[in-house]
Amino acid sequence: MTILEIVFLERRPFKLFHLEKVRFQSFARLWTKNGEVMSTEMPGPSFELLSRCKGVVLDIGPGSGEMISRFNPEQIIALYGAEPAEVLHPGLVRNAKTRGFKSNFHPLVCGGEPESLIPALHKSGVLDISGKAGSAEDGVFDEICCTRVLCGVPHPQQTIKGLYSLLKPGGRMVIAEHVANPWRTEGRMAARFMQVVFTLIGWPFLMGGCELQRHTAEYLRDAGEWDKFDLKYYGTEEVIPFVVGELIKKHASLDKSYAAAVKV
């Protein structure tokens, strides 16, 4: 439907050569119609984990903000929402205000990948080291939330390492992501097979870049050192199983030269 809209309603067929824009528009169309319903339930302790977020928080891929209702604004100093689909931002801002976030909510038109996120954070005033913040080890955020978003970032391993760098030592990462079915341990081979089938018939393109076969738990473990790594699988007999949990970044000494340049 997205392709038909671009060609016949917008009358901009050359837009099809910009696959990134098509992907965002496809996702925006899907989320506008189904985002609220898809956010009424989440596997495991997803909502409880989000409700405990505090301090300076980065929410990757909040869409139009349906999940913002799960945050407690009284515990949050500043909430940054990194959403690349700009068409979803009016709903995102509206939902943030409804929930009680005002001047402490900052929408960012960017994705979670470093080449998109770092410039946006620099522009917003959070980062004050041009070109260096993405690899710094001191971090900026007390918490980073990834809810059904790492399935769609272009380079998941690079993106996750970048997010790890932005997390303060001792900071928490909240994860609720669908992943490749763990059929070798606790999943089902039939479900894993169907993930392959859906991918071959065009799931990623039709679903706005969403990938069914990512080993996100492994990517997270390899991103850096963790004091706590608590992820559990949910729905392992299904085609779309999830990993849900929290990770605590290993404590380390701060680089004061970098810390002095970080503003929140």
Can you annotate each of these PLM segments?
Residues L117-I144:
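A short acidic, Gly/Pro-enriched loop at the edge of an enzyme's catalytic core
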Residues M1-W31, E36-M38, M42-S46:
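N-terminal, positively charged/glycine-rich alpha-helical extensions of SAM-dependent methyltransferases
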Residues F17-H18, F24-E36, A176-V244:
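C-terminal alpha-helical "lid/dimerization" subdomain adjacent to the S-adenosyl-L-methionine
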Residues L58-G125:
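Class I SAM-dependent methyltransferase SAM/SAH-binding core
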